[in-house]
Amino acid sequence: MPEALEKWDCNLVQQLLPAVYDIILRIEEQFMTEMYQKGVDKAQANRMKLVQDGMVHMARIAVYASAHTNGVAAIHTEILKDSVLKDWYQVYPERFQNKTNGITQRRWLALCNPELSGLLTELLGSDDWKIHLDDLKQLERYA
């Protein structure tokens, strides 16, 4: 998941968005003060810096500024907690959670696509598929 951890060159941010960059630096200062107050050791706090090695770390800013960090699927949340954002989880364990943001067949088919919903009901002989998604396997005979 490191590919999801977006970083921006400090010079670019400073050149294009100087006021935003100043705010980021103030947030960084506040963050480091908070880490000191929480008793986070210096090595860990340095690994968590919002601005590091000439880059603004957007995911770190997001975790710091947010009340919750959602891994969506349970396995992704565990990856975040165990490796990708491990330092952050150690400091803010209460913020990490997972809530799957998926759609349901009832919502997508029955409400958003009534024509397809009608066809499925017609082919299957009832609308039980809206409750029992496995009923859709009966459609394989039409494939």
Predicted features by range, described:
Residues 1-143:
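A conserved ligand/cofactor-binding region detector
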